[in-house]
Curated annotation (Swiss-Prot):
<feature type="lipid moiety-binding region" description="GPI-anchor amidated asparagine">
    <location>
        <position position="274"/>
    </location>
</feature>
<feature type="repeat" description="2">
    <location>
        <begin position="61"/>
        <end position="68"/>
    </location>
</feature>
<feature type="compositionally biased region" description="Polar residues">
    <location>
        <begin position="200"/>
        <end position="228"/>
    </location>
</feature>
<dbReference type="GO" id="GO:0098552">
    <property type="term" value="C:side of membrane"/>
</dbReference>
<feature type="repeat" description="3">
    <location>
        <begin position="69"/>
        <end position="76"/>
    </location>
</feature>
<keyword id="KW-1003">Cell membrane</keyword>
<feature type="disulfide bond">
    <location>
        <begin position="257"/>
        <end position="265"/>
    </location>
</feature>
<feature type="region of interest" description="Disordered">
    <location>
        <begin position="111"/>
        <end position="261"/>
    </location>
</feature>
<feature type="glycosylation site" description="N-linked (GlcNAc...) asparagine">
    <location>
        <position position="249"/>
    </location>
</feature>
<dbReference type="InterPro" id="IPR001136">
    <property type="entry name" value="MSA2"/>
</dbReference>
<dbReference type="Pfam" id="PF00985">
    <property type="entry name" value="MSA_2"/>
</dbReference>
<feature type="repeat" description="5">
    <location>
        <begin position="85"/>
        <end position="92"/>
    </location>
</feature>
<protein>
    <recommendedName>
        <fullName>Merozoite surface protein 2</fullName>
    </recommendedName>
</protein>
<feature type="compositionally biased region" description="Low complexity">
    <location>
        <begin position="124"/>
        <end position="148"/>
    </location>
</feature>
<keyword id="KW-0449">Lipoprotein</keyword>
<feature type="glycosylation site" description="N-linked (GlcNAc...) asparagine">
    <location>
        <position position="177"/>
    </location>
</feature>
<comment type="function">
    <text>May play a role in the merozoite attachment to the erythrocyte.</text>
</comment>
Length: 300
């Protein structure tokens, strides 16, 4: 009987110590794991913002370099092409204008050669204005001389034979009407010449086509410039999105844990719950074993 009591007591102490050790091991491991997980999450929360900021800075630098390089290349190339083309177009236009034989037509030819798109939008109205300004001065000079000659002729010889001299106002009105008719005829004759000179000159057409090519390159170059910018912004948006996702989840889980909703907590709280459950089970087993040992010791 004494042996059984002693063995039961020894067994009780061994079992209690074993359970205490296991409980301490499980509790320590789960608590340590939970603590490590919380530390890792806190480190992850602190690291991704710094990494994202560094990545966004690198992305901004690469984007700026790409934009600067492509912009400089595109602007330099298009600028050189545009200057060369406009120079050649101006020479060709002035040559065609010289053949036509009027300074105003030479100016309009240079304008068409330098910027064919703007002159095509304007239409033939601008060269018409230049030609009318040059011809009106000549017409006024010619009408003044012709009116004086006609006045002298009318004073010397009267067509009616009655010795009456025509009034100078009537002569001036007639000469002005004639000058207006001449001006209209000159403007009508000059307008198609400028158009024909611009369209028929074989040298102006290929040079105008060459001039239109840099404009097409200029219109395409902003798209090329905007491409690396779009990439840069896409990278920034992705990084910021990935950065902002983690703290939101953690903040929600922290709010839910602080409110008392343990079902929606993170892995750290679940591990703590498991460790507490295991500790309670171990305590329950210890109590049962203690009662059994005491019962055997008492009744036996």
């Amino acid at each position: 009987m004494k042996v059984i009591k002693t063995l039961s007591i020894i067994n009780f102490f061994i079992f209690v110590t074993f359970n205490i050790k296991n409980e301490s091991k499980y509790s320590n491991t789960f608590i340590n794991n939970a603590y490590n997980m919380s530390i890792r999450r806190s480190m992850e929360e602190s690291k991704p913002p710094t990494g994202a900021v560094a990545g966004s800075g690198a992305g901004a630098g690469s984007g700026a370099g790409a934009v600067a390089g492509s912009g400089a290349g595109a602007v330099a190339g298009s600028g050189a092409g545009a200057v060369a083309g406009s120079g050649a177009g101006a020479v060709a236009g002035s040559g065609a204008g010289a053949v036509a034989g009027s300074g105003a037509v030479a100016g309009s030819g240079a304008g068409n050669g330098a910027n064919p798109g703007a002159d095509a939008e304007r239409g033939p109205s601008t060269p018409a204005t230049t030609t009318t300004t040059t011809t009106t001065n000549d017409a006024e000079a010619s009408t003044s001389t012709s009116s004086e000659n006609r006045n002298h002729n009318n004073a010397e010889t009267n067509p009616k034979g009655k010795g009456e001299v025509q009034k100078p106002n009537q002569a001036n009105k007639e000469t002005q009407n004639n000058s207006n008719v001449q001006q209209d005829s000159q403007t009508k004759s000059n307008v198609p010449r400028t158009q024909d000179a611009d369209t028929k000159s074989p040298t102006a057409q290929p040079e105008q086509a060459e001039n239109s090519a840099p404009t097409a390159e200029q219109t395409e170059s902003p798209e090329l410039q905007s491409a690396p910018e779009n990439k840069g912004t896409g990278q920034h948006g992705h990084m910021h999105g990935s950065r902002n996702n983690h703290p939101q989840n953690t903040s929600d889980s922290q709010k839910e844990c602080t409110d008392g909703n343990k079902e929606n907590c993170g892995a750290a709280t679940s591990l703590l719950n498991n460790s507490s459950n295991i500790a309670s089970i171990n305590k329950f087993v210890v109590l049962i074993s203690a009662t059994l040992v005491l019962s055997f010791a008492i009744f036996i």
